[in-house]
């Protein structure tokens, strides 16, 4: 008996439909074709265990599974659920009449419970585009996928629930999310506020200009002058995300597996601050099957590079093209993937190796040659892409001890 079940492969931040064809006939062999990776091939053992634990027998017939289109590499364990359902459907354990109405994805544990997957949001968007009635995914991913309108999103806790759903013995949990209500309720709630900052009026003004015009900015100052504190508060004065920007940002974090369990739309601009030991691949994205890097996770938000000269020079130089093009294309033998990279770059650095060049009270111990060598770690082409460069002077004690609150982020946004 030939059965078709539908899943999806995520490439970049978009999904592609995968048709899983399962044919059951006389014999006792198992074949899985269609360019699966090792994790997909290992699904056979997970499915056997999951079925046994839940009181079902593995079909003893000859089973051939084809994952089409065959030119797309299928990776990861998220195909466990559609493969298991397809095998049971071909063996007539499951009624096949509803299989073509739903798209299924989920990783199986040995006890049959479903584990969360990456890319649930782009998968849900693709399911709606193709006219599916709904999708069945792990419960942990349902809020993320339920932001897609006009699509039924069902959450399942284990394999048995899905089997009984297709046999009309049990209803799965149908998840609804009021996308607009959730988006606008959380939009302007920030943990950090500019009212915490004492003094630094000129730096605040520069950050306001950067926020209003989308300009990159470099903060140069001694240790303890407040560079990081100011940079971390920049998202609180940026224009609020639009619903379209929020959806795109959420897709990127969904593909990277960075959304927390039960998370829905990202309603605030992301802030990413990687350590200076980061590799080039982690910054730009990549891998055998390309995943978003820090510059893509900062899309529509802020990328903060603290201690800029301490970053590997190659890591800094690869930022030049994404800063210009607002996108990055990662090329591999098997595929080319494009990720968006429209972010505001905020960088900070000390003025010299010791950190106290031009300090009002402390003496610098660096020679002119050491200072120049330190500054030369940042190339001219990269500095040319940073529109605003401002010196951050340490705040005197008198201003630090002032009990009056500073201007709030909400007031700055209204200017």
Where are each of the predicted segments found?
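Conserved AAA+/SF3 P-loop NTPase catalytic/coupling segment centered on the Walker-B
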Residues: 275, 291-324, 356-359, 379-385, ...
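Peripheral, non-AAA+ core regions of ATP-driven protein-machinery
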Residues: 1-218, 222-225, 266, 331
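P-loop NTPase nucleotide-binding/switch module
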Residues: 170-209, 213, 240-295
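Walker A/P-loop
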Residues: 218-261, 325
